[in-house]
Protein backbone atom coordinates (compact mmCIF):
# COMPACT_ATOMS: atom_id res chain seq x y z
CA UNK A 1 0.00 0.00 0.00
CA UNK A 2 1.44 3.34 -1.00
CA UNK A 3 2.11 6.00 1.59
CA UNK A 4 -0.26 8.93 1.76
CA UNK A 5 0.16 12.11 3.74
CA UNK A 6 -1.88 10.68 6.59
CA UNK A 7 0.09 7.44 6.65
CA UNK A 8 3.58 8.81 6.13
CA UNK A 9 6.28 8.47 8.73
CA UNK A 10 7.62 11.99 9.16
CA UNK A 11 10.73 13.19 10.96
CA UNK A 12 10.68 15.82 13.68
CA UNK A 13 8.64 18.87 12.74
CA UNK A 14 11.29 21.42 13.69
CA UNK A 15 13.36 22.75 12.10
CA UNK A 16 11.96 22.36 8.58
CA UNK A 17 15.10 23.73 6.89
CA UNK A 18 18.68 22.66 7.57
CA UNK A 19 21.55 24.85 6.42
CA UNK A 20 23.83 23.23 3.85
CA UNK A 21 27.17 23.73 5.60
CA UNK A 22 27.27 20.69 7.91
CA UNK A 23 29.30 17.59 7.22
CA UNK A 24 28.70 13.89 7.92
CA UNK A 25 24.94 13.95 7.68
CA UNK A 26 22.53 13.02 4.92
CA UNK A 27 21.36 15.56 2.37
CA UNK A 28 17.57 15.56 2.17
CA UNK A 29 15.39 17.25 -0.41
CA UNK A 30 11.82 17.21 -1.66
CA UNK A 31 11.08 16.65 -5.33
CA UNK A 32 8.06 17.02 -7.62
CA UNK A 33 7.62 17.17 -11.38
CA UNK A 34 5.12 17.77 -14.17
CA UNK A 35 2.38 19.57 -12.27
CA UNK A 36 0.92 21.15 -15.45
CA UNK A 37 -1.21 23.44 -13.31
CA UNK A 38 -4.00 25.36 -15.02
CA UNK A 39 -7.76 25.72 -14.71
CA UNK A 40 -8.56 23.97 -17.96
CA UNK A 41 -10.89 20.98 -18.10
CA UNK A 42 -9.46 17.50 -17.43
CA UNK A 43 -7.96 15.74 -20.42
CA UNK A 44 -7.66 11.98 -20.19
CA UNK A 45 -5.78 11.19 -16.99
CA UNK A 46 -4.66 14.79 -16.51
CA UNK A 47 -6.57 16.76 -13.87
CA UNK A 48 -5.00 20.18 -14.29
CA UNK A 49 -6.66 22.21 -11.47
CA UNK A 50 -6.13 19.43 -8.92
CA UNK A 51 -2.37 19.82 -8.90
CA UNK A 52 -2.78 22.84 -6.63
CA UNK A 53 -4.20 20.61 -3.90
CA UNK A 54 -1.66 17.91 -4.68
CA UNK A 55 1.19 20.40 -4.29
CA UNK A 56 -0.27 21.70 -1.02
CA UNK A 57 -0.17 18.18 0.36
CA UNK A 58 3.41 17.68 -0.85
CA UNK A 59 4.60 20.96 0.64
CA UNK A 60 2.91 20.06 3.91
CA UNK A 61 4.95 16.86 4.06
CA UNK A 62 8.12 18.67 2.97
CA UNK A 63 7.74 21.29 5.70
CA UNK A 64 7.61 18.53 8.32
CA UNK A 65 10.55 16.53 6.96
CA UNK A 66 13.76 18.43 7.83
CA UNK A 67 14.77 19.10 4.23
CA UNK A 68 17.68 21.07 2.82
CA UNK A 69 15.72 22.24 -0.23
CA UNK A 70 12.86 21.45 -2.60
CA UNK A 71 13.09 21.24 -6.39
CA UNK A 72 10.57 20.84 -9.21
CA UNK A 73 11.70 19.20 -12.44
CA UNK A 74 9.71 21.22 -14.97
CA UNK A 75 6.27 21.69 -16.54
CA UNK A 76 5.17 23.55 -13.45
CA UNK A 77 2.19 25.03 -15.30
CA UNK A 78 0.13 24.53 -18.43
CA UNK A 79 -2.13 26.70 -20.59
CA UNK A 80 -5.70 26.86 -21.91
CA UNK A 81 -6.77 25.12 -25.10
CA UNK A 82 -6.44 28.52 -26.76
CA UNK A 83 -3.07 29.91 -25.61
CA UNK A 84 -3.27 33.22 -23.76
CA UNK A 85 -0.10 34.73 -22.33
CA UNK A 86 -1.74 36.65 -19.48
CA UNK A 87 -3.90 33.72 -18.43
CA UNK A 88 -0.87 31.42 -18.50
CA UNK A 89 1.09 33.84 -16.33
CA UNK A 90 -1.79 33.85 -13.86
CA UNK A 91 -1.54 30.07 -13.60
CA UNK A 92 2.21 30.34 -13.10
CA UNK A 93 1.82 32.96 -10.37
CA UNK A 94 -0.76 30.86 -8.53
CA UNK A 95 1.24 27.63 -8.49
CA UNK A 96 4.53 29.43 -7.76
CA UNK A 97 2.94 31.10 -4.74
CA UNK A 98 2.08 27.68 -3.34
CA UNK A 99 5.53 26.28 -4.19
CA UNK A 100 7.16 29.11 -2.27
CA UNK A 101 5.33 28.14 0.93
CA UNK A 102 8.11 25.62 1.52
CA UNK A 103 10.07 26.90 4.50
CA UNK A 104 13.50 26.72 2.91
CA UNK A 105 15.31 27.05 -0.44
CA UNK A 106 13.38 26.18 -3.60
CA UNK A 107 14.70 25.53 -7.10
CA UNK A 108 13.16 25.17 -10.55
CA UNK A 109 14.06 23.17 -13.64
CA UNK A 110 12.53 24.42 -16.88
CA UNK A 111 10.26 22.09 -18.86
CA UNK A 112 8.86 22.49 -22.36
CA UNK A 113 5.36 23.41 -21.15
CA UNK A 114 6.84 26.26 -19.13
CA UNK A 115 7.36 28.04 -22.47
CA UNK A 116 4.19 26.95 -24.25
CA UNK A 117 2.72 30.46 -24.48
CA UNK A 118 5.30 32.54 -22.62
CA UNK A 119 9.03 33.16 -22.94
CA UNK A 120 11.84 31.97 -20.69
CA UNK A 121 12.22 35.54 -19.52
CA UNK A 122 8.55 35.56 -18.53
CA UNK A 123 9.03 32.36 -16.56
CA UNK A 124 12.12 33.66 -14.78
CA UNK A 125 10.42 36.94 -13.87
CA UNK A 126 7.48 35.11 -12.29
CA UNK A 127 9.47 32.50 -10.33
CA UNK A 128 12.34 32.57 -7.84
CA UNK A 129 15.26 30.25 -7.17
CA UNK A 130 17.31 30.36 -4.00
CA UNK A 131 20.47 32.45 -3.86
CA UNK A 132 22.74 32.75 -6.88
CA UNK A 133 20.49 30.44 -8.91
CA UNK A 134 17.76 33.07 -9.18
CA UNK A 135 16.82 34.19 -12.71
CA UNK A 136 18.93 31.43 -14.29
CA UNK A 137 17.76 28.53 -16.46
CA UNK A 138 20.84 26.42 -15.77
CA UNK A 139 23.04 26.65 -12.71
CA UNK A 140 24.76 24.71 -9.93
CA UNK A 141 24.74 24.86 -6.16
CA UNK A 142 26.49 22.97 -3.37
CA UNK A 143 24.75 21.46 -0.37
CA UNK A 144 26.70 19.61 2.31
CA UNK A 145 29.62 19.01 -0.06
CA UNK A 146 27.45 17.60 -2.88
CA UNK A 147 27.28 19.54 -6.14
CA UNK A 148 23.84 19.79 -7.75
CA UNK A 149 23.71 20.79 -11.42
CA UNK A 150 20.51 21.96 -13.12
CA UNK A 151 20.42 21.74 -16.93
CA UNK A 152 18.13 23.42 -19.47
CA UNK A 153 17.43 21.38 -22.63
CA UNK A 154 14.61 23.64 -23.79
CA UNK A 155 16.23 24.70 -27.04
CA UNK A 156 15.61 24.00 -30.70
CA UNK A 157 18.21 22.09 -32.68
CA UNK A 158 19.67 25.39 -33.95
CA UNK A 159 20.28 26.47 -30.35
CA UNK A 160 17.49 29.03 -30.13
CA UNK A 161 15.49 28.89 -26.90
CA UNK A 162 11.98 27.55 -26.63
CA UNK A 163 9.79 30.64 -26.76
CA UNK A 164 5.99 30.94 -26.74
CA UNK A 165 5.40 27.58 -28.36
CA UNK A 166 7.92 27.96 -31.21
CA UNK A 167 9.23 24.43 -30.72
CA UNK A 168 8.80 20.74 -31.38
CA UNK A 169 8.80 19.16 -27.92
CA UNK A 170 10.35 15.96 -29.33
CA UNK A 171 13.54 17.84 -30.25
CA UNK A 172 15.07 19.13 -27.03
CA UNK A 173 18.70 20.24 -27.22
CA UNK A 174 21.50 21.51 -24.97
CA UNK A 175 23.38 24.21 -26.93
CA UNK A 176 27.13 24.62 -27.15
CA UNK A 177 27.51 27.41 -24.61
CA UNK A 178 25.75 25.32 -21.97
CA UNK A 179 27.81 22.26 -22.88
CA UNK A 180 30.99 24.28 -22.37
CA UNK A 181 29.67 25.53 -19.03
CA UNK A 182 28.88 21.94 -18.01
CA UNK A 183 32.39 20.85 -18.93
CA UNK A 184 33.79 23.54 -16.64
CA UNK A 185 31.46 22.50 -13.83
CA UNK A 186 32.61 18.89 -14.15
CA UNK A 187 36.34 19.67 -14.16
CA UNK A 188 36.43 19.69 -10.38
CA UNK A 189 36.19 16.08 -9.27
CA UNK A 190 36.38 16.50 -5.51
CA UNK A 191 32.62 16.29 -4.88
CA UNK A 192 29.82 13.87 -5.73
CA UNK A 193 27.43 15.32 -8.31
CA UNK A 194 23.68 15.06 -8.90
CA UNK A 195 22.07 16.25 -12.15
CA UNK A 196 18.55 17.68 -12.49
CA UNK A 197 16.94 18.02 -15.94
CA UNK A 198 13.43 17.88 -17.41
CA UNK A 199 13.89 15.88 -20.61
CA UNK A 200 15.62 12.51 -20.42
CA UNK A 201 19.34 11.92 -20.88
CA UNK A 202 19.26 8.10 -20.95
CA UNK A 203 18.77 7.93 -24.69
CA UNK A 204 20.83 4.72 -24.65
CA UNK A 205 18.02 2.92 -22.79
CA UNK A 206 14.75 1.41 -24.01
CA UNK A 207 12.86 4.69 -23.58
CA UNK A 208 11.30 6.43 -26.58
CA UNK A 209 13.85 8.71 -28.21
CA UNK A 210 11.30 11.52 -28.61
CA UNK A 211 11.41 11.92 -24.82
CA UNK A 212 15.17 12.38 -24.75
CA UNK A 213 17.55 15.26 -25.24
CA UNK A 214 18.60 15.13 -28.90
CA UNK A 215 22.30 15.48 -28.11
CA UNK A 216 22.24 13.25 -25.03
CA UNK A 217 24.93 11.14 -26.69
CA UNK A 218 27.21 14.17 -26.31
CA UNK A 219 26.23 14.93 -22.71
CA UNK A 220 26.29 11.46 -21.15
CA UNK A 221 30.00 10.80 -21.91
CA UNK A 222 30.85 14.04 -20.10
CA UNK A 223 29.03 12.76 -17.04
CA UNK A 224 30.64 9.35 -17.24
CA UNK A 225 34.12 10.85 -17.61
CA UNK A 226 33.69 12.81 -14.38
CA UNK A 227 33.40 9.61 -12.37
CA UNK A 228 31.52 11.22 -9.48
CA UNK A 229 27.98 11.48 -10.88
CA UNK A 230 25.61 9.76 -8.47
CA UNK A 231 22.35 10.15 -10.37
CA UNK A 232 20.36 12.06 -12.96
CA UNK A 233 16.86 13.09 -11.83
CA UNK A 234 14.45 13.66 -14.72
CA UNK A 235 10.78 14.47 -15.40
CA UNK A 236 8.86 14.80 -18.69
CA UNK A 237 7.76 11.14 -18.99
CA UNK A 238 4.77 10.97 -16.67
CA UNK A 239 4.83 7.19 -16.38
CA UNK A 240 8.33 7.24 -14.88
CA UNK A 241 11.41 5.28 -15.93
CA UNK A 242 14.73 4.00 -14.62
CA UNK A 243 18.00 2.99 -16.19
CA UNK A 244 21.61 2.56 -15.12
CA UNK A 245 24.89 2.75 -17.00
CA UNK A 246 28.52 3.12 -15.99
CA UNK A 247 27.76 3.78 -12.33
CA UNK A 248 25.13 6.48 -12.98
CA UNK A 249 21.47 6.08 -12.05
CA UNK A 250 18.90 7.73 -14.34
CA UNK A 251 15.61 8.08 -12.46
CA UNK A 252 12.58 9.61 -14.15
CA UNK A 253 9.90 10.70 -11.71
CA UNK A 254 6.21 10.09 -12.26
CA UNK A 255 4.20 13.22 -13.04
CA UNK A 256 2.05 14.81 -10.35
CA UNK A 257 -0.60 15.73 -12.95
CA UNK A 258 -1.63 12.12 -13.54
CA UNK A 259 -4.75 10.79 -11.85
CA UNK A 260 -7.64 12.18 -9.89
CA UNK A 261 -7.76 13.11 -6.22
CA UNK A 262 -7.96 11.80 -3.56
CA UNK A 263 -6.17 8.61 -4.57
CA UNK A 264 -3.49 10.02 -6.87
CA UNK A 265 -0.47 12.22 -6.33
CA UNK A 266 3.29 11.93 -6.84
CA UNK A 267 6.04 13.44 -4.72
CA UNK A 268 9.09 12.21 -2.86
CA UNK A 269 11.66 12.90 -0.18
CA UNK A 270 15.16 12.01 -1.36
CA UNK A 271 18.00 11.27 1.04
CA UNK A 272 21.67 10.98 0.10
CA UNK A 273 23.64 9.38 2.92
CA UNK A 274 27.31 10.11 3.75
CA UNK A 275 28.32 7.06 1.67
CA UNK A 276 26.50 8.60 -1.34
CA UNK A 277 23.72 6.02 -1.41
CA UNK A 278 20.38 7.53 -2.42
CA UNK A 279 16.99 6.56 -1.01
CA UNK A 280 13.81 7.86 -2.63
CA UNK A 281 10.88 7.86 -0.21
CA UNK A 282 7.92 8.06 -2.58
CA UNK A 283 4.33 9.00 -1.87
CA UNK A 284 1.19 7.80 -3.68
CA UNK A 285 2.08 6.91 -7.29
CA UNK A 286 5.79 7.55 -6.73
CA UNK A 287 7.44 4.31 -5.64
CA UNK A 288 10.27 4.00 -3.15
CA UNK A 289 13.63 3.41 -4.81
CA UNK A 290 17.20 2.81 -3.64
CA UNK A 291 19.96 4.15 -5.89
CA UNK A 292 23.02 2.71 -4.23
CA UNK A 293 26.54 3.80 -5.00
CA UNK A 294 28.50 0.98 -6.60
CA UNK A 295 32.26 1.20 -6.10
CA UNK A 296 34.65 -0.71 -8.32
Role assignments for model-derived ranges:
Residues 31-33, 70-74, 106-112, 194-197, ...:
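Active-site neighborhood of phospho(di)ester-bond hydrolases with catalytic His/Asp-centered motifs
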Residues 1-19:
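N-terminal export signals
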Amino acid sequence: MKKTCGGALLLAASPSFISCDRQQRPVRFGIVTDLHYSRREPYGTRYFPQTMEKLKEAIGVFNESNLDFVIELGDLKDQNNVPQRERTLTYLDEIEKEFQTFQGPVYHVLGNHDMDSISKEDFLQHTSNHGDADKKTYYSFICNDIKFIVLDANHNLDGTPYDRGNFDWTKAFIPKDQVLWLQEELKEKDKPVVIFIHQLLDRFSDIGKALCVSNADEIVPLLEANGNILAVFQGHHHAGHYSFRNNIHYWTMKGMIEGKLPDNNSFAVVEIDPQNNIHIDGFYNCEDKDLNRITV
